[in-house]
Amino acid sequence: MRHLPFNVQRSMFNVLRNATLSKRERSMFISILLAVTLHATAQKAVVEESVVDVVCDSRTHAIQNFRESTTILNEQGASLAHFVCSCSKNDKLTAFKGQVTDSSGRVIRKIKESELQRTEYSPYLAIDDYQMFFEYTPPVYPITITYEWTIDSHDNLIEFPRFCPQTDYDVSVKKAAYTLTAPKELAVRHALLNIDNTVNVSENAKGSQVLSLELSDLPALKDEPYSRPLRERLPMAYFAPTDFTYYGTQGSLKDWREYGKWEYSLINGSEVLPDAVCQELHQLTDALKTDREKIEALYQRLEKTTRYVAVLLGIGGQKPAPAANVCKSGFGDCKGLSNYMRAMLKVVGIPSNYVTISTTNRQLLKDFASVGQMNHVILQVPLQGDTLWLECTNPQLPMGYVHDDIAGHNAIEVSETGGRFVQLPVYADSANLMHSKIHIQLDSKGAADVSLLQDFHNWQYEHYIPLLKMDEKDRHKTLQRMIRVPQAEIGRMDVREDGATITVDAEVKSQRYATTTGQRLFVPICPIHNGYTTPPTLPNRQEDIYLEAGYLDKDEITLTIPEGYEIEAMPKDQTVEQPFGTFSFTVKREGSEVRIQNSLLMKSGTYDKSQYPQFIDFMKKISGIYSQKIVLRQSKS
């Protein structure tokens, strides 16, 4: 009963001690009370048992047995009732069964292997992998659903299944166990994240090595605002062989250097292009003076002649398609497109490096090399005094722009000498700039013409890329959500892109910008930052405050006072400084105009959870300043 508060445990004990209940009634009572209590604490499920048992009998073959039993407490946990497992021609589902029990332990549904469905992928995808799945909607709550299945894997043991019994917020774990049995001569490495327990290594009666890990009573994680991503908080264990055989290739994962040697063996020789294409590339670039200009020309060619398509073929999806094939077909995945760009650069004499990276994990395990930590490939181009990082799956991005999914991430640079652990650059907080110039022409009835000129740079630029492809109607709807202008009518709206900057130039009319009361106008000082909210109070916050990306918002606002009105009340200048950021607000009258300047710098970083009340106060002050009004009064004649 460790999941329940002490007073609830005591009440349960007293009821059970004094009541005459059958075994089934006791079980039902406990299940119902458990569900009610956990529902009151917003928990949606309990993993009763999560078991992974891997039996590896050689470098090329393993049987993986899984058992998952989960009690789903309410509708919020309904998706946890579904079953899904990844398969391929080398990972076969050989056994499956499932069952659903109600709160009394009565079996209300059995699930057969014949009921599983197989995913149907788009015909445009070149892919070997598929998924077997079953979707189940609980008829009542709570219910317990149990799945057991077996995967037979051969010729692809570059790593063993990860152990991650906790996969979502508001889900606790009662018991979880992982066991890996392997030949003694097969060196197996492991790494633990967010786990205090240790892996036990022993030998069984047959002389095989046995690695085992047990976890119990894991509390549910809460989805708290401004906290680390869930994937960085989950308990997780990695297991992988040091030396491997993978789809007929041989390699080592002793360290990242050895991993890089194997990766290089997959791409070496795949960058050859036909002579006719090479001549075309020289015609395109020979007259250009600098390497950067040549790279730009080839990057634009990549954009115009290729498109992204997922390709999970060739050495388990790890080997890129030959550059000549990508050139001919016009499509490829991140591996194929990056390799094709590498090939074009090589033709014109510019060296580059193939780089593997994760778009989800900012940090790789420096002392534990494994393929599964990465899910993406980009290209690195060393230049004198600079290094370009090319995103080849989306060449619509400005050349060399390091987008949010990879900025600051660890990566592995692959070359003939092996893998090198590197980190991509991240833009300074102040470089993620939104600069707004606004003029508000107010009339005596509270109506206003608002001209808006906004520049979005870098990280803020990424958020508004969708504007570039929207039609006029959708652009207008988006702008209306961005601004604090009641009854906004968008008259004109232009959207321009220049490198990693998007500019929005718009004219907005409002018949009720200011509120009229008698002889007074109450005028909002800031027509933008709509929806700026403060986080909720959390008395028992679990996580430190995490601000992944900092930014700078600068506003220059000019308000023209209507003829016949004078200022009765005006906000005072304010400056707010905290570890998380700084905010300054200034306002002054210049003739018939009021000039307002806002500057908010949010600082990326991790801050102790004890500072959360201070953080809320900081955000409330900013929200309050943005919401201030100037009071205008009709002049006395």
Where in the sequence are the language-model features?
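Short, basic, low-complexity termini and linkers enriched in Ser/Thr/Gly/Pro
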Residues: R2-M28, L33-T37
